[in-house]
């Protein structure tokens, strides 16, 4: 199985999005929203509310992953050692 999530972004905007319970990640170009959702739910044992994707001018695919209110995006990043 191919890992769809390449890395999580820690920028000024992505840190502001954490307050809205949204994770920001660079994902594989072939990844579809439903596959990203399933992978996040499986890896971190959380429920995802929705996934929005866009392709950056650099040619990377970025995903905004909104978690359900019962889960904390900040906790996930702290488990990964980002914070």
Swiss-Prot record:
- To which species is this protein native? Archaeoglobus fulgidus (strain ATCC 49558 / DSM 4304 / JCM 9628 / NBRC 100126 / VC-16)
Q: Name one GO cellular component term.
A: ribonucleoprotein complex
Indicate the quaternary assembly.
Part of the 50S ribosomal subunit. Contacts protein L29.
Lineage, top-rank taxon, reads Archaea
**InterPro entries from the UniProt entry:** Nucleotide-bd_a/b_plait_sf (IPR012677), Ribosomal_uL23 (IPR019985), Ribosomal_uL23-like (IPR013025), Ribosomal_uL23/eL15/eS24_sf (IPR012678), Ribosomal_uL23_CS (IPR001014)
- Molecular function, one GO term: structural constituent of ribosome
Please state which protein family the record places this protein in. Answer: Belongs to the universal ribosomal protein uL23 family.
User: What is the name listed in the Swiss-Prot or TrEMBL entry for this protein?
Assistant: Large ribosomal subunit protein uL23
Q: Which UniProt keywords apply?
A: Ribonucleoprotein, Ribosomal protein, RNA-binding, rRNA-binding
What is the protein's known function?
Binds to 23S rRNA. One of the proteins that surrounds the polypeptide exit tunnel on the outside of the ribosome.
What does the entry give for GO biological process?
Answer: translation
């Amino acid at each position: 199985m191919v890992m769809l999530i390449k890395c999580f972004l820690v920028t000024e905007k992505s840190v502001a999005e954490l307050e809205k319970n949204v994770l920001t990640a660079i994902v594989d170009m072939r990844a579809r929203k439903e596959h990203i959702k399933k992978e996040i739910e499986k890896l971190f044992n959380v429920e995802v509310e929705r996934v929005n994707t866009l392709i950056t001018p650099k040619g990377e695919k970025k995903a905004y992953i909104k978690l359900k209110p019962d889960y904390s995006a900040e906790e996930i990043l702290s488990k990964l050692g980002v914070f």
